[in-house]
Amino acid sequence: MGLSFTKLFSRLFAKKEMRILMVGLDAAGKTTILYKLKLGEIVTTIPTIGFNVETVEYKNISFTVWDVGGQDKIRPLWRHYFQNTQGLIFVVDSNDRDRVVEARDELHRMLNEDELRDAVLLVFANKQDLPNAMNAAEIIDKLGLHSLRQRHWYIQSTCATSGEGLYEGLDWLSNNIASKS
């Protein structure tokens, strides 16, 4: 009896750990999102060559978030981060209409990788504060998200600089990764 109570207690109250990979085209806002979540403030960023990794604590969950540079020359390196990824955050600059097709192509290329077959997908439609930003419905269409029949996905409108939508996205991730394990 004592052992089963201990198991139940630890399941309810032990910190859960989740491995998250955050990718997207360059200048989409990945690093700004990472440090807004980690520090609660806006940091001055430069283009990420390589990666940033931080642990973000939220609601008894420890998210290890890998923010990988998005410049086209380093995108082939993304696959080196796929192993053991439970959740994929794909960040889209909602104001960048010129490169949304490029974003779609990169997203679908990644989702076809065997190592990511079980990862849930959260799309952050970032930069919603800009006047010409595409809304979530438009991003869903442009990224072809409805064609993802076998993939559990969600889109969250965000503004990295204000933090709007970021924690709602983490809530969805934690609920959906937890339900798969």
Curated annotation (Swiss-Prot):
Catalysed reaction equations from the record: GTP + H2O = GDP + phosphate + H(+)
Record-level GO cellular component terms: Golgi apparatus
Keywords attached to this entry: ER-Golgi transport, Golgi apparatus, GTP-binding, Hydrolase, Lipoprotein, Myristate, Nucleotide-binding, Protein transport, Transport
SUPFAM superfamilies membership: P-loop containing nucleoside triphosphate hydrolases (SSF52540)
EC number, as in UniProt: 3.6.5.2
UniProt main location, coarse: Golgi
GO molecular function, one term: GTP binding
GO BP of this protein: protein transport; vesicle-mediated transport
UniProt cross-references to Gene3D superfamilies, sorted A to Z: P-loop containing nucleotide triphosphate hydrolases (3.40.50.300)
Lipid attachment locations (N-myristoyl glycine): G2
A Pfam family of this chain: Arf
Binding site for GTP: 24-31, 67-71, 126-129
The UniProt record lists the keyword Plastid: no
Top class in the EC scheme: hydrolase
Cellular location(s): Golgi apparatus
UniProt similarity note: Belongs to the small GTPase superfamily. Arf family.
Task performed by this protein: GTP-binding protein involved in protein trafficking; may modulate vesicle budding and uncoating within the Golgi apparatus.
Name of the molecule in the record: ADP-ribosylation factor 1
Organism of provenance: Daucus carota (Wild carrot)
Protein's gene: ARF1
